Curated annotation (Swiss-Prot):
Keywords assigned: Cytoplasm, Protein biosynthesis
Its job: Directs the termination of nascent peptide synthesis (translation) in response to the termination codon UGA. In Stylonchia UAA and UAG codes for glutamine.
Species in which this protein is naturally found: Stylonychia lemnae (Ciliate)
Family per record: Belongs to the eukaryotic release factor 1 family.
Protein name: Eukaryotic peptide chain release factor subunit 1
NCBIfam families listed in its UniProt record: aRF1_eRF1 (TIGR03676)
Recorded name of the encoding gene: ERF1
High-level lineage: Eukaryota, Sar, Alveolata, Ciliophora, Intramacronucleata
Subunit organization: Heterodimer of two subunits, one of which binds GTP.
Compartment(s): Cytoplasm
Amino acid sequence: MVESIAAGQVGDNKHIEMWKIKRLINKLENCKGNGTSMVSLIIPPKEDINKSGKLLVGELSAAQNIKSRITRQSVITAITSTKEKLKLYRQTPTNGLCIYCGVILMEDGKTEKKINFDFEPFRPINQFMYFCGGKFQTEPLTTLLADDDKFGFIIVDGNGALYATLQGNSREILQKITVELPKKHRKGGQSSVRFARLREEKRHNYLRKVAELAGSNFITNDKPNVTGLVLAGNAGFKNELSETDMLDKRLLPIIVSIVDVSYGGENGLNEAITLSADALTNVKFVAEKKLVSTFFEQISLDTGMIVFGVQDTMKALELGAVETILLFEELEITRYVIKNPVKGDTRTLFLNPTQQKDSKYFKDQASGLDMDVIAEDQLAEWLCHNYQNYGAQVEFITDKSQEGYQFVKGFGGIGGFLRYKVDMEDALGDVGDGGDDFDPDTDFI
């Protein structure tokens, strides 16, 4: 049997693409080979694809010398499959190319299954890798899981200001300015008052310039182009900048950290990145907490604009009423489409792991006939591939925050914000999506 798995192309939701890669990595890591029959090939962007083709020709020639006939044949088959996949591409795709081919052992340790797939990652992998062994190599894929939220940094002191961004492990200096502010005047008399006034005026103008450049660097199309903003410095400038009305009001809500650093310029940037690490990590969790808290608030207010539980959520989605789906990233519900072999009618079931082992869900209750399973998908995967067909968005929820944990345990890990009110009792009717013995206390788990 040949299995073809393809990661999604670049979508409008990076978190969905990251979720797909995370699931793919888990699948690959669970694959075990019989000997050295599993090939992993990753080609970075702009790499000459013919170079990899020549490498495979050499590896294929070397495989002919393997003494064990069974091992030799397995390795040759895996490398040949990789070559065939490579032939599908005239040049390396924009984000690089990943190919995994080989024969794996099933859970019984005896049955073999052929794995054979290729895909372009949703963002570049800048690392070449070729490996032929008893398992698939996934380390380069993990770089795709680094959260690519972009954060802005302003390092400001009495000598100048630096504007930069940090995205994953990549930082970029956007702009630097220098300034020469007059020192404090130590002499008394009228001249000291005049110098103090001039000094304060230059300081004010300097802060105005810093604030203006903050807007030009971190606002695009009338909205912030970074997820969060860090202000850093070794004097009072950073605090004044956060408190002044000269800073664009659109930037104020995204200030996530204000830190003291010992240096200005790039050394100050390095220090600010280190000191603000916890704050940057918390941004994602804060966003999740806010989203789920809003969900709970809507429930407590009984607005009728919330749906939860697998059956209600999926029916509302089918009606086009769901605007945003909240989905636990490790949801263990499988979507089945079953067909009556005599009548020809179909039904859709959403079953948890316990229900999947119960044969009653796969029988026609009137006749006792076994139903034909014509589709079987993890519900989370199905949603990730089909949510756009219903005009919805997907937001993944973890169980790492208190709110996320409550959403998973108390509401089944799936729910949504509605576009309009839906009478779920009328909408559901007698649909048996969970079987006639649907139990909300177990079917939501």
